[in-house]
Design a protein with these regions (language model features):
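TM-loop-TM module centered on a large, flexible mid-protein loop between adjacent transmembrane helices
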Residues: 84, 91, 123, 197, ...
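Membrane-helix boundary/coupling elements in multi-pass transport proteins
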Residues: 78, 101-116, 213, 218-231, ...
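Membrane-interface loop-to-helix entry segments
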Residues: 131-189, 219, 242-246, 250, ...
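Membrane-interface "cap" regions at the ends of multi-pass membrane proteins
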Residues: 1-40, 44-49, 63-67, 79, ...
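Extracellular loop-to-transmembrane helix junctions
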Residues: 13-14, 38-137, 141-143, 248, ...
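C-terminal membrane-solvent junction of multi-pass transporters and transport-like membrane proteins
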Residues: 158-159, 336-343, 386-452, 481-485
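Helix-loop-helix connectors at the membrane interface of multi-pass transporters/channels
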Residues: 9, 83-93, 114-134, 166, ...
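Helix-loop-helix junctions that connect adjacent transmembrane segments
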Residues: 7-13, 52, 125, 129, ...
């Protein structure tokens, strides 16, 4: 696919993302509505133990995926990322489908974040129409990406810094509450893990059922692959960012879910559930309310709003760059390949903004229903992208070795090959196919829910095989793979 680093007279993407930008994108890029808003649903539906185990398993899977992506991105740092790798090391139609799938994934995720902004703002302004907030925040995201890649990087750096600091404070307060040393609190210990059907409410099927929501929480981790195409010294900075992933997963997700489950019973109706109308108060806010910090709860809601803007900002960046790359390769209308003087693909940005604007439909159909529908749809397409990363890395490494290249020449090498990509592929596949399987066992099948859950699979296959049949493409043989000694 396109190489953004060739020197031409025409404007090109600029490598203006510094090491600190890339590091904060890796640490905080995926800390958003999935963790702050939707995490309560996982505890409510699967129980504290089921939710925690789901986060641990998927967190391990994501870590393996990021080591795979780190190896690929450090070797070939392009904004097309795994869509480029899928084309070069698997099959051209496969890369084409991955690119469009990922663009759709983030375009929908922006809409999800805008819906979440309505829910957060209703905490303070319950009588204000939600579409007003969506329009305002969509405009902010648009402007941050319209200015320059540095504008995106700086905004994401400070957004992520606020989120990271907040989660650390949340963990400290939560631990103090659990052990009973917080002022006015009684130690909770592990008592909430023994009520009703806890800790594994619903058993294995419930864990599979919430896995897609957990997957949505981790979406954005792969943004370092997209940002590689505009980062300074990617061979050095990408490995550094990848090494941050494990500790982020351990601290920001696993610890946060554990603390929420220890303080708030999974039977608490305030947690996000399908039959609860008010989902504007997140589990993080509820924890501060339990601590008696009522003013801090309002501050936490503001932080959640920052997280929503951050996730939407990242989504706007990722989808715009992917659409630009597709256009440069002739796989999308050429108009989207045009860059501004500052190296911003603004036509691609305009198109993505229009699609994200469909979130305004939520004011017509009801926030909760549309929010959960978009959440599941986006989660499925995200898993497909991760499957693409695992497959691309496996074939990349196999081809690299078969052609006699020295692994020591790789700027970064995943230490878990072939276990890492195989484990990630198998777990991704199980969750993708097993999601919402209980719908088929019911007396009456809810085809609306089934469609929302699985629509990403047929869309991906139609795009892939439609391109393959039209263009007559075939799988790339190991002997035909191109491995330049240094990609500039």
């Amino acid at each position: 696919m396109v190489s953004e680093t060739k020197t031409t007279e025409a404007p090109t993407l600029r490598r203006e993302l510094k090491a600190r930008h890339l590091t904060m994108i890796a640490i905080g890029g995926s800390i958003g509505t999935g963790l702050f808003v939707a995490s309560g649903a996982t505890i409510s539906q699967a129980g504290p133990g089921g939710a925690l185990l789901s986060y641990i398993l998927i967190g391990l899977m994501v870590y393996f995926l990021m080591t795979s992506l780190g190896e690929l991105a450090a070797f070939m740092p392009v904004s097309g990322s795994f869509a480029t790798y899928g084309q070069n090391y698997v099959e051209e139609g496969f890369g084409f489908a991955l690119g469009w799938n990922y663009w759709y994934n983030w375009a929908v995720t922006i809409a999800v974040d805008l819906v979440a902004s309505q829910l957060v703002m209703s905490y303070w302004f319950p009588d204000t129409p939600g579409w007003i907030w969506s329009a305002l925040f969509l405009g902010i995201m648009f402007l941050l990406n319209w200015i320059s890649v540095r504008g995106f990087g700086e905004a994401e750096y400070w957004f992520s810094l606020i989120k990271v600091a907040t989660v650390i404070i949340f963990i400290i307060v939560g631990v103090m509450m659990i052990v009973g040393i917080f002022k006015g609190s009684q130690p909770t210990g592990w008592s909430n893990w023994g009520i009703a059907d806890a800790p594994f409410a619903g058993g294995f099927s419930a864990m599979i059922g919430v896995a897609m929501i957990v997957g949505f929480s981790f979406q954005g981790t792969e943004l370092i692959g997209i940002a590689a195409g505009e980062s300074e010294d990617p061979e050095k900075n990408i490995p550094r960012a990848v090494r941050q992933v494990f500790w982020r997963i351990l601290l920001f997700y696993v610890f946060a879910i554990l603390i929420i489950s220890l303080i708030i019973p999974y039977t608490d109706p305030s947690l996000l559930r399908n039959d609860v109308k008010d989902i504007s108060v997140s589990p993080f806010t509820l924890v501060f309310q339990h601590a008696g910090l009522l003013s801090a709860a309002a501050v936490m809601n503001a932080v959640i709003l920052t997280a929503v803007l951050s996730a939407g900002n990242s989504g706007m960046y990722a989808s715009t760059r992917m659409l630009y790359t597709l256009a440069c390769d002739g796989k999308a209308p050429r108009i989207f390949s045009k860059l501004s003087r500052g190296g911003v693909p603004r036509n691609a940005l305009y198109a993505t903004t229009v699609i994200a604007g469909l979130c305004f439909l939520t004011s017509m159909f009801g926030n909760q229903t549309v929010y959960l529908w978009l959440l599941n749809t986006s989660g499925m397409t995200g898993f497909i992208a991760w499957l693409g990363i695992a497959i691309s890395h496996y074939r990349f490494r196999r081809g690299y070795v078969k052609q006699g290249h020295d692994l020591n020449n790789l700027p970064y090498r995943s230490g878990f090959f072939p276990l890492g990509p195989i484990f990630a592929f198998v777990l991704c596949l199980i969750i993708t196919l097993g999601q919402n399987y209980e719908a088929f066992l019911a007396d009456t099948i809810d085809w609306g829910a089934v469609t929302a859950t699985y629509i990403g699979i047929p869309l991906f296959l139609i795009i892939w095989f439609g391109y393959k049949l039209t263009k007559g493409t075939r799988f790339v043989r190991y002997s035909e793979m191109d491995f330049p000694e240094r990609f500039k």
